C-alpha cells in the first residue's frame, strides 16, 4: 500500500525506469498488398429432410455478412415467430427430400472393399489370439 501511495508523487520516468510502452498494432490494420477483398460466400447448402435447416439455408442467404452463431440464433427466433402457413413451405420441402432419399443407390465396389477389409482384420485378430 505504501508503494502505491509513493508512485502518485514520483514522476513516471523515475519509478518506471524510463521505459516507453510499445503500442500494439492490430492485425487488421496491416496493409494487404495486391490482395482483393474476398466476398463471403452466401451459399446455403443442400436441401435436407429437416424443415428448420431448410429455413436456415434461406435465412443465411438473406443475411450474408453475419457470423454463423448469430444466423442460428436470429433464425431460430424468426422460426418460432412464423405462422403455420409460412412453415408449411419448408415442411413440404422436407417431405420431398424424404421421397428422393429412397432413390439413391450406393456403389457396389465400396461394399466389397469394406467387406474385404473386415475379413482381413478378423483373420489377423484370430491369428494373434490363437496359442502356438
Curated annotation (Swiss-Prot):
Disulfide bonds: none annotated. Residues 17-46, 96-115 are annotated as: Disordered. The keyword Amino-acid biosynthesis does not apply. Testis. It is found in: Nucleus; Chromosome. The keyword Disulfide bond does not apply. Belongs to the UPF0771 family. This is Protamine. Its main location: nucleus. GO terms for cellular component: nucleosome; nucleus. Keywords: Chromosome, Developmental protein, Differentiation, DNA condensation, DNA-binding, Nucleosome core, Nucleus, Spermatogenesis. Protamines substitute for histones in the chromatin of sperm during the haploid phase of spermatogenesis. They compact sperm DNA into a highly condensed, stable and inactive complex.
Amino acid at each position: 500500500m505504501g508503494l502505491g501511495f509513493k508512485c502518485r508523487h514520483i514522476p513516471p520516468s523515475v519509478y518506471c525506469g524510463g521505459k516507453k510502452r510499445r503500442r500494439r498494432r492490430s492485425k487488421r490494420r496491416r496493409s494487404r498488398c495486391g490482395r482483393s477483398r474476398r466476398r463471403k460466400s452466401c451459399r446455403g447448402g443442400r436441401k435436407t429432410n429437416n424443415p428448420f435447416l431448410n429455413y436456415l439455408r434461406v435465412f443465411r442467404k438473406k443475411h450474408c455478412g453475419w457470423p454463423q452463431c448469430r444466423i442460428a440464433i436470429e433464425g431460430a427466433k424468426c422460426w418460432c415467430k412464423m405462422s403455420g402457413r409460412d412453415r408449411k413451405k419448408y415442411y413440404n420441402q422436407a417431405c420431398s427430400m424424404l421421397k428422393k432419399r429412397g432413390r439413391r443407390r450406393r456403389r457396389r465396389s465400396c461394399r466389397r472393399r469394406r467387406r474385404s477389409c473386415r475379413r482381413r482384420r478378423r483373420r489377423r485378430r484370430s491369428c494373434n489370439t490363437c496359442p502356438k
